[in-house]
Amino acid sequence: DNCDTVYLDTNGLTIKACSDATAGDTGVIDGVTYTVVDEAMLRTMIDNDSILTNKVTSLVTDMSDLFKDNSTFNQNISTWDVSNVTTMIGMFNNAISFNQVIDFWDVSSVTDMSFMFYSATNFNQFIDLWDVSNVTETAAMFEYATAFNQDISSWDVSSVTDMGGMFNNTTAFNQDISSWDVSNVTNMNGMFADTPFNQDLSTWDVSNVIEMGSMFTNNTVFNQDISSWDVSNVTNM
């Protein structure tokens, strides 16, 4: 291939590293110099409050806790290539300033998004384009993400098994997710606790759910008909 170091993806936004690129390599696209980084370099740069908008993350597979407790970070990282990342657990956990466009991220390799936006109290961006079909863990993903109220109805959550606390204390969230395939979910503990959520869930297949403890605790508005739910496997309500 004629790839030099980095290139612009066909989506017109993501900057990717060429297949033979190594950490530290640089390349220029549209007059901007981009640097290929590995996980260790990236974490050090974050610790040093470095500019991250021109970093190429194709070599990174683990972004767990990347911005955890980083109260000031709010840089544009829309060009990041996350197509090789498998875990984003706690990635923006308590990153209270972050609110940037990340809708074009290719998250199709990610399996764990639990606690990803936990207490990310400013985040409220469109992420409906995300391919989450390989994600198995979304526990507490938006817990205490008090601003988040976006349409994520098109998400393919058919691989998810743990949604415990997913929207717990997501105090703005009230979106239609009736079309979600939750047939593989076993844990829904506290899923809509302390939220204003009041949407139709009557068609959800919850037949594999075992844990439903505190699912709607302190949700004072939910009044939907869920009498058709098959809760025969539930051991904790």
Which residues are covered by each model-predicted region?
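Negatively charged
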Residues: 1-236
